[in-house]
Amino acid sequence: MKTFTTDDVMIRDVAPTRVAIMEHRGDPATLGATIQRFIAWRKAAGLHPRTSPTFNVWRSERRPASPADYSVDLCVGTDQPIEANGEQIKAGEIPGGRCAVLRVVGNTDNLEPAALYLYRDWLPASGEEARDFPIYCQRLSFFPEVPEHEAVAELFLPLK
């Protein structure tokens, strides 16, 4: 498992991003099915990952006490009007502002170690304060579009 250092984290000002959101609420064991629905909807809407950024916004712990409490938003950046096409899709925004950014290269299926590094190690030592928006990631490239060792995700911890 990769270990992270303060040199891996940069503070970046990010612009607000309008997104289409498919919410996953409930047992993480069913997340794969939600992801497949999201991919199918996204293809039908013409929002290809190369031209429309992909985000995950984690609204719960990775393993909440009750699986029913698991919550993540699957998002795609778009300025287009949202066509739900029979899916539960809503418009939203990832707010802009200062963020601590940590890039993860390789297997990006489990970003929990990187998120825990930001919260438990980097944040207390940095003198920064977290803002009132959950940690999220932008998936810059992902398997199977690229070989697994070339997958890239950036975690964003919103700061005050």
Spans of features found by a protein language model:
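A solvent-exposed interaction/effector surface
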Residues: M1-K160
